[in-house]
Each structure stands twice: as C-alpha cells, then as structure tokens.
C-alpha cells in the first residue's frame, strides 16, 4: 500500500510517500520559522496561508522524488489534530479533495500518534510494549504503549509543556524563536553550577510534570542579574545550562519511575524536544543502568513531518480503518480515544 502523508498541524508543511513494502520513498518539508520569527511565535493566520501556498508544490516534489504518479497512490493520510484549526483544515481539505478526485480513501491521523510511531521508521524499531515520553511544544506525557491505539496515559504536565517552557524561557532572555534550539546552543557555552534550578515534582510520588515554576525561577534569576547590571551573554548561557539541566533531569527521573512502575525496559522518546542531545544522553545513560533500550527518530523526524503521518496512516489503513470524505479536525484530541488495532 502506497500512502501519501500530509502534515499541517502548526508551522511546518510536510509531505511524504510511504510504501508498506518498500518503506519511506520520499519526504519533503517546508518550515515557516523565518516567517514567524519576527513575531516571536507562530501566527495562526499566517501559518494557514503559507500551508495553502506550499502544499501542492510539495506534493509534486515528493511524487517526482519517488518517481511516482498520482495513480500509484492507494490512500492519503493527513493530520486531523491536535493543532491549529486553520492549519489543520488546509491539510484536511487538500487530502479529502485529492481522495475524492483520485477515488481513494483518506484517513485523519492523530498528530502525537504520528510522533510516537516515528521511531519505527528507523532500522532498529522498538517492539511493543514500551513506555513513551511524548515531549514537544504542546505536550509532555508518559504513555504505556501495548500496540497501535493501545495507549494508557501514565502522567502528563499540569501546566506548561517542556517545549513550551524552553521557548518561553528563551524569549524572556531575548533569544530568537524557536527558543528550544537557542537554549540548547547557549547551554553548550554555560558554566555548570553557577545557577541551580528546582527539579519540579520529583520529590513526590507520581508521574505528573510541572514546568511553570521552573520557568518562573529562570525568569527571576535573569531579572535579578539584569538588576545587578549583569545581562552578559555568559550569564544568559549559564542560565540556559541550568534550565536545560533541570528539565532533562526532571524528565529522566520521571521516565525511570515510569519504567519501574510498568516493569518495562524499553523507552521511546518522541516529539520536538526528543532531538535535544542532552536529553538523549541522559536517557541513554539511565537505560544503560537499567539494562534497557531507548529509541528515538532521526533528528529531522523529531519535529513535525509528513513521514510520520504517512507511516501512522498506513498502519491504520492496512488494519481496515476507514472514514468518509467529510472534513473534520480537532484542536484538542486525546490519544487514548483512538481505536486500538
């Protein structure tokens, strides 16, 4: 089965072709980072308009790269949520229109299920069951995964997601959007031990997260330094390092706790923050001590992309899941509501 995948949940337009027998044939991505940087964050209306502009050229590019034509495609998978409604509608309407014109099925895919399954595109994919850490700008969740659509939420953030905390902390220190990579870059030049921030909710049982207070601690420290006349680049780097260390250690502690609670030895990390090298190193060390394994996607598939949507859609389509050609998207959508395969 050859599936065309379309991703338009936020500020990346992603298109890919995945074949159930040959694997990933082609993928293309256009990032809107430069478009939104001047505003310090994503402007939904601008995002939607740019998706309209980029979608069809990217589809043509992907078909050409895979040496395929429209009649080769068996089905279309598109992101139906969660995400920005206007952006989602661009991908959904395009998918349904093409499906109608080509007389093939179209299936809406859960954005975070796409992220969760992205490591399965790698040469050494994880095997069920496993614990997944979904960590992005909008989500921080620990999930037990027993199969596709068989998800048990173990814990999630009570306020800011980890990626959101990275972005907001970077913004308040005058760094460019997107803030996560800027924090990581600055942290490489930081001096360890100058600042120490709390590891929120690690001193109590449970698998919930909270990053709002950590973000506030970083803000207060930065403002105190500014008040003392020290707003140097080195101070910014030192705060970035302390902040990143706090987030990484918090996530690692909670992941270790989840693995022990479930008795599992395999951990998948997915979502934009899973590309963070410090987080990967910390989790690899922790899993090494537990004699377990950690899995993640290649860096370009950690952020939003069409390949993960094509793959996730292919799994569900092959299992017989079907939808009509009505256009329906969801800004909020619990992954536990998905049907199991």
UniProtKB/Swiss-Prot annotation:
One Pfam family of this protein, by short name?
Answer: TsaD
Looking at the record's lineage, which domain of life comes first? Bacteria
For the ligand (substrate), the binding residues are 134-138, 167, 180, 276
Q: Which reaction does it catalyse?
A: L-threonylcarbamoyladenylate + adenosine(37) in tRNA = N(6)-L-threonylcarbamoyladenosine(37) in tRNA + AMP + H(+)
Binding residue positions for Fe cation:
111, 115, 304
Q: What is its main location?
A: cytoplasm
Binding note for cofactor = Binds 1 Fe(2+) ion per subunit.
One term under GO cellular component: cytoplasm
**This protein's record includes keyword Iron:** yes
The Gene Ontology biological process annotation of the record reads: tRNA threonylcarbamoyladenosine modification
The Swiss-Prot or TrEMBL record lists the needed cofactor(s) as:
Fe(2+)
Molecular function terms, GO-annotated: iron ion binding; N(6)-L-threonylcarbamoyladenine synthase activity
Which keywords fit this entry according to its UniProt record? Acyltransferase, Cytoplasm, Iron, Metal-binding, Transferase, tRNA processing
Matches recorded under Gene3D superfamilies: 3.30.420.40
**Could you say which EC number(s) this protein's record lists?**
2.3.1.234
Subcellular location, in the record's words?
Answer: Cytoplasm
Question: What family does this chain come from, according to its entry?
Answer: Belongs to the KAE1 / TsaD family.
The record ties this protein, via NCBIfam families, to: gcp_kae1 (TIGR00329), T6A_TsaD_YgjD (TIGR03723)
Function comment: Required for the formation of a threonylcarbamoyl group on adenosine at position 37 (t(6)A37) in tRNAs that read codons beginning with adenine. Is involved in the transfer of the threonylcarbamoyl moiety of threonylcarbamoyl-AMP (TC-AMP) to the N6 group of A37, together with TsaE and TsaB. TsaD likely plays a direct catalytic role in this reaction.
Q: This protein is called what?
A: tRNA N6-adenosine threonylcarbamoyltransferase
| Species this protein is from | Pseudomonas savastanoi pv. phaseolicola (strain 1448A / Race 6)
